[in-house]
């Protein structure tokens, strides 16, 4: 493989597979607010948040980590101001103390934070403005959960960056394709990727254990094992769902994310880990399979976009299915069939925000990926011209990406309208 392409793929994994404490949208709000408070240099009198619809959608129903069960944009922002450490970025709330939680509860009840919907902006858009007397500081985040594009203090612009990927961390995701991903997985020097992949295995396995031991959320993972038994096909989706049960329920354990999402990070990894155990795979085989799952998921998301009405569990599960087929020695054709079969089955599940039902959607998506895997190994796959299925895997990925990015735009708006009570459904 060309060295430039090889280095780009390594960099993609390093950039994308990072730890995050709690659901990434409320964490991004906490980070923006904590950073604004740091710039202000004193404790503010109040905070004003302006957020895109997708941010509001993904924060409204999820428990803010380390908040003792509190929910909402105001809670995330206030907790970031009161007890957050902006230098920790996606782990901004890791060092929160009990007194910070109680103060957050009091300030939220007193209306300390206001939030307004910002329309006609990027899907991932957050502005945190903190005020003290006549002084203020404002931090803007666009496109990535920790990508600050502007810092203002008292009308003076202290920092401004292009609304694009950080230049120092730039990677070209347009170079991703299934064929090259498989070549990279087969040939990569494990030492170049072991750090990020081992961290993903360790952290995501720990939160899956937590979700199976304790009754978080709707207990999807626990219910799957109780009702359907202990077969690897059940364990694979149960552990991914259990991790989401815990994360959506406010568990403070960190997760290694994929495409900016903890749920997607767990979905691309935990089913693959479970199948690798059942097949008695070596650590190296597991690492190479995780390269496949992570990059296949990221490949799809570059067409779908970071936040949309398209449930990211589906693209993540496609990655898992591809990696499971890879573990079984599947060819490029078998792996392509797995991806197409998964997209053709559950592509288009809607995202109506981060919440407890995400775990159920993960279970459904992983189930479809496992079915897609078994069909693919038998050389069965949905044919070109059937729905959005194209002549090859790349065309099918692009067509589903178009549906998610363009076709579901109005769906996204109407989901938000329902969630914030802007429409009456008769």
Describe the residue ranges of each PLM region.
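Internal helix-turn-beta structural module
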Residues: 338-426
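Hydrophobic alpha-helical bundle architecture
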Residues: 36-39, 65, 275-288, 298-364, ...
